[in-house]
């Protein structure tokens, strides 16, 4: 959620930042609604003060039957009636919060202006692309190996699901353990095993609700399946005050993730690129405003290190204002090269959300010896999605006979296996 005080004091800049997100000016409307709310709040405080004063006088009066006593009683009764009306007005005046809840984060000054991904800015590339590489797509390879099943899975669950078997299932498990080891041992992230069913308020805190209600799966019991472990991880600090010396707090988790893929009809209908259910290793950092920019580079480096160790070519793009996520103020996308598609495809998003999520979930920190609190900054990064990483490995390490060479760093995790070959039932 955005800072209403900042909006009030920077109305022109606020409208300019909204325009970069292709949203019409809102400062005048927000200022008007805010003024109404503040007036009601001020009146409530005045009546509460008057009630305290009159109640204290009543409590000190010795004669309970005097005309003055009865007059004060009538005054207190009238005040209570007015307070009830005002508090009802305040509770019914939800338009301001509803409006703020639908507004995205303010773009950082470094974020380029642009309407879509075509205007993202290249930051750097890694690795050499082999123009003569074999170019079968992952679903062709996996199906031929008899280790990737879409047809039977569709009968079980419908479209956008997959069943991995044998050595591909083992590769999935190897990737999870490899990624967790890198992030915990080399980058000091603390491993978490969080729930994948969360309440609506946890989704709201992370910026998923109310804007993206249709993009997640809701259960009949008031829970939602997480679209990313970011939801569970950032909520670890919800409604808390953290000691400054404990920051940064860095969390890593592997979970299954669930997305309805609303609006993705016709996109990536074949293969493992866009599924309703997929495994992902997620990174979350909680830090101070002063350190969030450095932490953004740190968490991005943690993500790209996985691709470097797997020797997979990639590039990093700074997302433009029109392509950036709802809760982010600045985002790097890591795009891995897929020989089968002959193009870069997104494999990770690394975002600095500033205090946007923290304001929603009331996550603060304070310096030692001080009573003053400040909102933390939250950051998140994919570290990485298992399915898309497997896609890149299958396409980049394929051989003429359809077998897949295991990347060196994964051989021990695969129990010494160096090549995946066709499975014969």
From Swiss-Prot:
Q: Name one Pfam family in it.
A: tRNA-synt_2b
Q: In which pathway does it act?
A: Aminoacyl-tRNA biosynthesis; selenocysteinyl-tRNA(Sec) biosynthesis; L-seryl-tRNA(Sec) from L-serine and tRNA(Sec): step 1/1
What does the entry list as the binding residues for ATP?
259-261, 346-349
Q: Where in the cell is it found?
A: Cytoplasm
Main location per UniProt? cytoplasm
Query: What broad class of enzyme is this?
Result: ligase
Task: Indicate which residues the UniProt annotation says bind L-serine.
Answer: 228-230, 282, 382
Molecular function as annotated in GO:
ATP binding; serine-tRNA ligase activity
Q: Which InterPro entries match?
A: aa-tRNA-synt_IIb (IPR002314), aa-tRNA-synth_II (IPR006195), aa-tRNA-synth_II/BPL/LPL (IPR045864), Ser-tRNA-ligase_type_1 (IPR002317), Ser-tRNA-synth_1_N (IPR015866), SerRS_1_N_sf (IPR042103), SerRS_core (IPR033729), tRNA-bd_arm (IPR010978)
Superkingdom is Bacteria
Q: Which UniProt keywords apply?
A: Aminoacyl-tRNA synthetase, ATP-binding, Cytoplasm, Ligase, Nucleotide-binding, Protein biosynthesis
EC number(s): the record gives 6.1.1.11
What is one GO cellular-component annotation here?
cytoplasm
Reactions accelerated catalytically: tRNA(Ser) + L-serine + ATP = L-seryl-tRNA(Ser) + AMP + diphosphate + H(+); tRNA(Sec) + L-serine + ATP = L-seryl-tRNA(Sec) + AMP + diphosphate + H(+)
Q: Does the keyword Ubl conjugation apply?
A: no
Q: Name one GO biological process term.
A: seryl-tRNA aminoacylation
Domain note for this entry? Consists of two distinct domains, a catalytic core and a N-terminal extension that is involved in tRNA binding.
Q: What does this protein do?
A: Catalyzes the attachment of serine to tRNA(Ser). Is also able to aminoacylate tRNA(Sec) with serine, to form the misacylated tRNA L-seryl-tRNA(Sec), which will be further converted into selenocysteinyl-tRNA(Sec).
Q: How does it assemble?
A: Homodimer. The tRNA molecule binds across the dimer.
Q: Which family does it belong to?
A: Belongs to the class-II aminoacyl-tRNA synthetase family. Type-1 seryl-tRNA synthetase subfamily.
The UniProt entry, under PANTHER family, shows: SERINE--TRNA LIGASE (PTHR43697:SF1), SERYL-TRNA SYNTHETASE (PTHR43697)
The identity of this protein, by name, is Serine--tRNA ligase
Species for this entry: Rickettsia canadensis (strain McKiel)
The record's gene field reads: serS
């Amino acid at each position: 959620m955005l800072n209403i005080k900042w909006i009030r004091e920077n109305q022109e800049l606020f409208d300019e930042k909204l325009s970069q997100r292709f949203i019409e000016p809102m400062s005048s409307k927000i200022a008007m609604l805010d003024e109404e709310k503040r007036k009601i709040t001020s009146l409530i405080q005045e009546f509460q003060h008057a009630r305290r004063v009159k109640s204290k006088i009543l409590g000190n009066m010795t004669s309970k039957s005097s005309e003055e006593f009865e007059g004060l009683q009538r005054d207190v009764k009238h005040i209570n009636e007015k307070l009830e009306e005002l508090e009802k007005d305040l509770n019914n005046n939800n338009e301001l919060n509803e409006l703020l809840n639908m507004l995205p984060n303010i773009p950082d000054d470094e974020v380029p202006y642009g309407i879509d991904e075509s205007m993202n800015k290249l930051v750097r590339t890694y690795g050499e692309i082999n123009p003569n590489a074999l170019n079968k797509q992952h679903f062709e390879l996996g199906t031929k190996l008899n280790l990737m099943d879409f047809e039977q899975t569709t009968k079980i669950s419908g479209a956008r699901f997959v069943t991995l078997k044998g050595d591909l299932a083992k590769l999935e498990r190897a990737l999870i353990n490899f990624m967790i080891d890198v992030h915990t041992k080399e980058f000091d992230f603390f491993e978490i095993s969080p729930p994948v069913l969360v309440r609506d308020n946890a989704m709201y805190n992370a910026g998923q609700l109310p804007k993206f209600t249709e993009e997640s799966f809701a259960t009949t019991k008031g829970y939602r399946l997480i679209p990313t472990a970011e939801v569970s991880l950032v909520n670890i600090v919800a409604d808390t005050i953290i000691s400054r010396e404990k920051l940064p707090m860095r969390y890593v988790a592997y979970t299954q993730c669930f997305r309805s893929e609303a609006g993705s009809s016709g996109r990536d209908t074949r293969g493992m690129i866009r599924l309703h259910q997929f495994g992902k290793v997620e990174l979350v950092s909680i830090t101070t405003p002063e350190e969030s920019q450095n932490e953004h580079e740190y968490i991005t480096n943690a993500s790209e290190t996985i691709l470097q160790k797997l020797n997979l070519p990639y590039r990093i793009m700074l997302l433009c204002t029109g392509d950036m996520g709802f809760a982010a103020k600045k985002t790097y996308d890591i795009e891995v090269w897929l020989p089968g598609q002959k193009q870069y495809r997104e494999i990770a998003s690394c975002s600095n959300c500033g205090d946007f999520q923290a304001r929603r979930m009331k996550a603060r920190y304070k310096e030692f010896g001080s009573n003053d609190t400040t909102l933390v900054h939250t950051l998140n990064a994919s570290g990485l999605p298992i399915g898309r990483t497997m896609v890149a490995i299958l396409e980049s390490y394929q051989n003429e006979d359809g077998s897949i060479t295991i990347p060196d760093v994964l051989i021990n995790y695969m129990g010494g296996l160096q090549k995946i070959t066709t499975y014969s039932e």
